[in-house]
UniProtKB/Swiss-Prot annotation:
EC annotation from Swiss-Prot or TrEMBL: 3.1.-.-
Main location: mitochondrion
Identification of the protein by name: Probable endonuclease LCL3
Compartment list: Mitochondrion; Membrane
UniProt organism field: Nakaseomyces delphensis
SMART domains listed in its UniProt record: SNc (SM00318)
């Protein structure tokens, strides 16, 4: 009788031990799954090293401050990660879109290629003070806007408006490649259009609103430098966008003068 009770006690202990192992394993697996797939990255410095060049991050563009950078609110897992029903997503304030009237000067300039960019509708206002990743679009350089009293480059406003029109308030994918000297995440960008997914860097080059990045430090192309240079050449030969100017000062030359 004692032997049977002892065996039963041993069986209970073994079962309890196995259950404990299963629960521990499940907890560890759940934690690893959460940290790998569902934990939000709240700034560029918080991106794990294992993510660079290997993983795409999904999220929403909450602000566009220049022609080649923006703020990205990471939404890991998307709908399945609870965003929009368990976890709140930032809502951007809408802008009342009013058709822009052309004054006499604009009428004289009607055929300037920049008009098609200036007149693009921007639906949302930037939303700041959020836990976002500051993103620098890889492989390209857009014309410089006015900084510290210095004049803006031609087509800098057009590049900004086009970028706001394309991605502000929208969801897209980024692949982190590096962190630049300003603490921004240099990344490849893919965003959805009615024609399918597009490479944001490539689209800017096709529109003539950026040129291939000239800097020697932190030059990142996501493996697409040849494609970028080919489409820069096409835009230049067709005098599209910024290439329509008689004399073009590159963003790199502009910055070297400051």
């Amino acid at each position: 009788m004692m032997s049977k009770d002892k065996n039963r006690t041993n069986d209970v202990l073994i079962e309890a031990g196995l259950l404990s192992l299963v629960l521990t394993g499940t907890t560890l697996a759940t934690y690893r799954g959460y940290t790998r797939y569902l934990r939000q990255i709240r700034n560029a410095r918080g991106i794990p090293s294992k993510v660079f060049r290997k993983r795409w991050l999904y999220g929403k563009v909450t602000a566009v401050g220049d022609g080649d950078n923006f703020h990205f609110f990471h939404m890991p897992g998307g709908l399945f990660g609870g965003w929009g029903w368990l976890r709140s997503t930032p809502q951007l304030e809408k802008i009342d879109i009013v058709k822009k009237s052309r004054n006499s000067k604009r009428l004289l300039d009607f055929f300037r290629s920049s008009n098609k960019y200036v007149d693009l509708p921007v639906q949302y206002k930037n939303k700041r003070r959020l836990p976002t990743i500051s993103v620098r679009i890889c492989g390209v350089d857009a014309p410089e806007r006015s900084h510290f009293g210095n004049p803006a480059q031609p087509y800098s406003e057009e590049a900004l408006i086009w970028l706001q029109h394309e991605i502000l308030g929208k969801k897209l994918w980024i692949k982190p490649l590096n962190i630049d000297q300003y603490g921004r995440c240099v990344a490849s960008i893919r965003y959805w259009t009615r024609f399918g997914y597009k490479d944001l860097s490539l689209q800017m080059l096709k529109e003539g609103l950026a040129l291939v990045y000239e800097g020697k430090s932190n030059a990142e192309f996501g493996g697409r430098e040849k494609i970028y240079r080919r489409h820069e050449f096409i835009a230049k030969s067709k005098r599209i966008g910024m290439w329509s100017q008689k004399k073009l000062e590159t963003p790199g030359d502009y910055k070297r003068k400051l």
